[in-house]
Amino acid sequence: MTRMRDLVERRPFMLGFAGFAVFPASVRAELEPFKVFKSPTCGCCSKWVKYMRENGFIIRTKDVSDEQLMKIKNMLRIPLKHRSCHTGIIGNYWVEGHVPASDLKKLLASRPDARGLAVPNMPIGSPGMEMGSRKDPFDALLVLKNNRARIFTRHNIIR
């Protein structure tokens, strides 16, 4: 996965003093820094990054053009049907779209043999896509090495 590492950059990641005050060391220690590629004009992407930071993730963002973002998604071989508005890379996984922090923490704790997590289609009520009290059901998908996906977590399911 050298290409992923090259995208993330090998420089050390820093978390500001405020982050250390908010998140206990035990939480910070289990989280890896990651890089998020997004459009500079996408408000929902910025809201998702803010949400992830509030949940303890150390994120470096890189604003890129739509063309550059498509090249990154193609290089990572993210299936078209699972694509969304922003792409992150953490360790050997990619994170596509409005994936909840709890799902990413679960992925990092379990370390499945997979390529990444995806929440396609920007569902209303997913992190960064809040619209009042409306919360549409959505699935976070685990995309396996063969590009097949299975449901990793279901969200906003009415029972």
What residue spans do the PLM features occupy?
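N-terminal secretory signal peptides
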Residues: 1-8, 16-22
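Sec/Tat signal peptide C-region and signal peptidase I cleavage site
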Residues: 25-29
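Local sequence-structure signature of Cys/Sec-based thiol-disulfide redox active-site neighborhoods
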Residues: 32-47
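Short active-site oxyanion
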Residues: 33-34, 58, 92-94
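Stable alpha-helical elements in mature extracytoplasmic
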Residues: 48, 65-68, 100-104
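Conserved helix-turn-beta segment immediately C-terminal to the redox Cys motif
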Residues: 51-60
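Thiol-based oxidoreductase modules, predominantly thioredoxin-like and allied folds used
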Residues: 59-70, 90
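Thiol/selenol-based redox catalytic cores and closely related redox-interacting motifs
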Residues: 74-159
